[in-house]
Curated annotation (Swiss-Prot):
It comes from Ehrlichia ruminantium (strain Gardel). PANTHER family: TRANSLATION INITIATION FACTOR IF-3, TRANSLATION INITIATION FACTOR IF-3, MITOCHONDRIAL. The keyword Protein biosynthesis applies. Keywords: Cytoplasm, Initiation factor, Protein biosynthesis. This is Translation initiation factor IF-3.
Amino acid sequence: MKSNKFSNKNKINEMITAKKVKLVDQDSVMVGVVDIEEALSRARSVNLDLVEIVHDDEYPLCKIFDYSKYRYSHKKKISDSKKKQKTIIVKELKFKLNIGDNDYNVKLNMIRGFIERGDKVKISLKFIGREILHPEVGMEIIERLIKDTSDIAKPENLPKREGNLINMILTTK
């Protein structure tokens, strides 16, 4: 069974059962193969812990360092990385077939804002009543959107028609 470097299941100080170990001191210098008693006395003399890093069949690799300080910094690093992760939000904007130029420009600016923030934008174009007879007009609006946002966004999937809707998702380039 392989153990990950510095896992939570590392053996520390007297928990190490091997008679001899490969020792790396606190300055990361390879000391060599020594008895476990000598390795423990070296660790105690500098008030640090002897930690088994890799368990081999012959001689486990042990290092001298402050294990509690390492565990604290490792947990802090993990929590900091979780805080920095950004969840991707999908914003949805709905269009109608007979959208005016000003309304189109307002929604285009909203799309640009969402994309610049790193969000995905779902575009839904809805056909009402007999508008469904002219899906090519809806595709023209979608293609115009793709062209107008081509400098900052790209379509994640091709526009597809589902009933009386045409859907498409835009993502950052």
